[in-house]
Each structure stands twice: as structure tokens, then as C-alpha cells.
């Protein structure tokens, strides 16, 4: 059985911070969104978002989210597709920032992703892709 390895995804968090600072997700508290990259998973997904369950919130933890990118898939994408993937995951966060998730449909879809993507100031995102 392969063990999944998780590490911080500072590049993904940089994209999240930049999208929020550009005003596309004003309801997102970037201090409550963590970003991870997983290696060794067999999922077909490119990325996924995890909300803090209501049981944890009832126990006194504040709502939060983890955006997980699947390293083997995410890092093969172009920069444009990486950004679109992060936008898609952020769309799952409801305006209430309650720890819950929005389903695919009216608000979480390719049309909404593209609508946001075409309005981005890409010059501010370049720093997220610097290596070394």
C-alpha cells in the first residue's frame, strides 16, 4: 500500500492570496485557508477542497478550508490551468465561510471559472510561479 505524502503548497496559497486580494473572493479569509500538495494518491482529481466539518465547528474550532492539489496531476498543467483549478476550488467556498461547501452547478462551473479568469491581473500572479 502506497503512503500518501502531504507537503505545504506555498505556490497554491500565493495564487489564493492574490485572487482574494484582486477582489474575486472577498468572503474568503486567507488566514483560514491552508494549501497542501499530496503525492502518491490514486485519485483522478486534479485538486479538491476540504471544509472543516460541523462537528469540529461545534467543538469550538473556527471554520476553515484546505485546498489539496494532487502533485502528479496539478504540476503537469499549464500556469493558466493551474490558476483555473484554484479558482474552481475557491468557488466551492460559500459566502458564509461556514466550513461547508457549495456543490457543482449554478455557481461552481466552467463558465464562472472562465468569467473570473479573464479578469485577472496576471502580472500580479507571476510571483507565485517563481522557483528556487
Task: Label each PLM-derived region with a short phrase.
Residues 1-80, 96-132:
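Metalloprotease/metallohydrolase-associated module, dominated by Zn2+-dependent proteases
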Residues 82-96:
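Active-site recognition of the HExxH zinc-binding catalytic motif
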Amino acid at each position: 500500500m502506497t503512503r500518501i505524502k502531504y507537503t505545504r503548497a506555498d505556490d497554491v496559497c500565493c495564487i489564493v492570496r492574490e485572487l482574494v486580494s484582486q477582489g474575486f473572493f472577498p468572503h474568503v479569509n486567507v488566514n483560514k485557508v491552508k494549501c497542501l500538495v499530496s503525492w502518491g494518491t490514486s485519485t483522478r482529481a486534479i485538486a479538491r477542497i476540504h471544509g472543516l466539518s460541523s462537528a469540529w465547528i461545534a467543538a469550538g474550532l473556527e471554520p476553515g478550508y484546505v485546498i489539496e492539489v494532487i502533485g502528479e496531476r496539478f504540476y503537469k498543467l499549464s500556469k493558466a490551468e493551474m490558476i483555473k483549478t484554484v479558482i474552481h476550488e475557491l468557488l466551492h467556498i460559500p459566502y458564509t465561510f461556514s466550513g461547508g461547501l457549495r456543490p457543482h452547478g449554478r455557481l461552481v462551473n466552467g463558465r464562472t471559472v472562465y468569467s473570473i479568469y479573464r479578469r485577472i491581473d496576471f502580472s500580479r500572479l507571476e510571483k507565485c510561479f517563481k522557483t528556487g
